[in-house]
């Protein structure tokens, strides 16, 4: 028998389809679907967002990439749809705040700029809101019912991952999780360049992959947060 929690989750997922319309695989534009499933207080997520994800914009890869962020991570959902976050209540609040920000801006550059601001200093998130130019819209969403609906939508997306995520940050390219060969930002850049099938001219960085591989690179040593594991705060 399907649990009441799952039934309710499916209902909310259907209810929010218009809000979260997004194909996991490459669309007609040929853009690479880059999805990041994360939680706001996961150390590895913070490092990846601040230090690595920015290269998508530094290298103009956003022109061939459809970047989507899903701030739910390893949170748990009870039968009455209560959300319990891995790193405590503060993480739930920041996840909801970031969900509202993602809703507020239509373009991925503005979305990333705000998320990066928060993840760079999670205790100073209020200044990110005040300096965003969208303070009222974000606060109205965060303080109203919409933030909860958005989080439930992200819960649906995260829980329906196939294969299921094992930890966060969890990154997928065109619906498939990164394999073990991707161990640095350069590796991720190369994967994006190779996955692009559209007609837009490739960013210069895609034509310099050979020289990139010869230069020293920072191997990822991310402090990931595993699913179904308790975290001591």
Curated annotation (Swiss-Prot):
Disulfide bonds join 42-45. The keyword Lipoprotein does not apply. Residues 1-26 form the signal peptide. Keywords: Disulfide bond, Glycoprotein, Lysosome, Secreted, Signal. Residues 200-233 form a propeptide. It is found in: Secreted; Lysosome. Transmembrane segments: none annotated. One of its GO terms (molecular function) is oxidoreductase activity, acting on a sulfur group of donors, disulfide as acceptor. Pfam families: GILT. Expressed in the outer integument of seed coat. Dimer; disulfide-linked. This is Gamma-interferon-responsive lysosomal thiol protein. The lineage of its organism: Eukaryota, Viridiplantae, Streptophyta, Embryophyta, Tracheophyta.
């Amino acid at each position: 028998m399907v649990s009441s929690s799952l039934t309710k989750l499916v209902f909310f997922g259907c209810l929010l389809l218009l809000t979260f319309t997004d194909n996991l695989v490459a669309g007609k534009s040929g853009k690479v679907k880059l999805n990041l499933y994360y939680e706001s207080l996961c150390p590895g997520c913070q490092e990846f967002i601040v230090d690595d994800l920015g290269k998508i914009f530094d290298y103009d890869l956003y022109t061939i990439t459809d970047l989507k962020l899903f701030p739910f991570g390893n949170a748990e959902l009870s039968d009455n749809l209560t959300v319990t976050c891995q790193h405590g209540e503060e993480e739930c609040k920041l996840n909801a705040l970031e969900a509202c920000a993602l809703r507020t801006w239509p373009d991925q550059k503005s979305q990333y700029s705000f998320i990066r601001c928060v993840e760079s200093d999670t205790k100073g998130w209020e200044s990110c809101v005040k300096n965003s130019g969208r303070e009222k819209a974000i606060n109205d969403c965060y303080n109203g019912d919409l933030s909860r609906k958005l989080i439930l939508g992200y819960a649906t997306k995260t829980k329906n991952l196939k294969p299921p995520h094992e930890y966060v940050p969890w990154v997928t390219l065109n619906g498939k999780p990164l394999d073990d060969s991707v161990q640095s930002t350069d590796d991720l850049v190369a994967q994006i360049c190779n996955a692009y099938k559209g007609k837009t001219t490739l960013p210069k960085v895609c034509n310099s992959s050979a020289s990139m591989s010869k230069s020293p690179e920072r191997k990822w040593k991310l402090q990931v947060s595993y699913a179904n594991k308790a975290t001591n705060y």
